[in-house]
Every structure is written in C-alpha cells, then in structure tokens.
C-alpha cells in the first residue's frame, strides 16, 4: 500500500484510498481453532486531503462485558458515516440516499477535507447513474 501510494505521489491532492474488509473476526476461537466472521472491524483512509495521523472513533475494549454478545467487538462507527463523507467531500456526490438507502443522517467525522455539499438522503432516483454523479467502486475479479 505504501509503494502504491508513493508511486502516485504526483496525484496526492486528487487521491483518496479507502481500505476495509466486508467483515471482521470474532475474538474467540471456534471448534477448529479458527475465528468466525464478526462485525467489529477497522478502516484506513489515505490521501493528500485526509486529516491523517489520527484514530477516529472510540475503542470499546476487550473485556467480555464490553463485547457484543460477549464475543464480537462493538461497532462504534458506521462505515457509511466514513464513506458518505468521502462521497460528498472528495467526489462531490451528495446523493447519499441513493448510494446508502436508509441512511438517516450525514454526520461527517472530519476525516477528509473538501467542500460540504448539502446531502440528499432521499432515494428518489431509480439508479445511481440517473443522478448525474459518479461513484467509483473498483471490482477486482478473482483470477483462476
């Protein structure tokens, strides 16, 4: 990731990289000494317009009483909160209701710099393409 970021150094002011997983891991081992999918996770954001060198969110703790159902890390920040801020401030796309149906509010954390457009939380548009805004979601296919 560092090499990729360095290779694109000429574009840092236009570059925002988000690294996340679609699932976390449970803290305890299962019957086969592995770990099952959990829901607490981490997300990293890199780029020239990122207010970096900080941790956003709160640490819930690892004591069994602090875990969700005594086995999962608590979720303290909704991933949509982070990604909606990037959509608005970095991609200039305020159509949050189309990208994230059911999102109740736009509450930026201050992770990235950029203009704050008034968010549109309605999902009135048939498809994202109908909005006239862009969302870049890379898809990497598995090579066989």
Indicate residue ranges for each PLM-predicted region.
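Feature marks hydrolase-like catalytic cores characterized by long aromatic- and Gly/Pro-rich stretches
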Residues: 2-121
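Long, low-complexity repeat tracts used as extracellular stalks/passenger repeats
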Residues: 119-133
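Conserved functional hotspot residues at active sites or interaction interfaces
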Residues: 138
């Amino acid at each position: 990731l560092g090499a990729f970021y360095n290779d694109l150094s000429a574009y840092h002011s236009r570059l925002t990289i988000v690294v996340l997983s679609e699932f976390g891991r449970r803290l305890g081992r299962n019957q086969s000494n592995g770990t099952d999918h959990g829901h607490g996770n981490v997300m990293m954001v890199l780029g020239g317009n990122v207010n970096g060198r900080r941790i956003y969110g709160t640490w819930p703790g690892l004591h069994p009483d602090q875990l969700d159902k005594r086995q999962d890390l608590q979720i303290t920040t909704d991933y949509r909160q982070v990604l909606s801020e990037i959509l608005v401030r970095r991609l200039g796309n305020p159509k949050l209701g189309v990208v994230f149906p059911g999102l109740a509010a736009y509450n930026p954390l201050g992770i990235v710099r950029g203009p704050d457009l008034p968010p549109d939380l309605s999902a009135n548009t048939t498809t994202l393409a109908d909005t006239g805004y862009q969302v870049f979601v890379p898809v990497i296919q598995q090579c066989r």
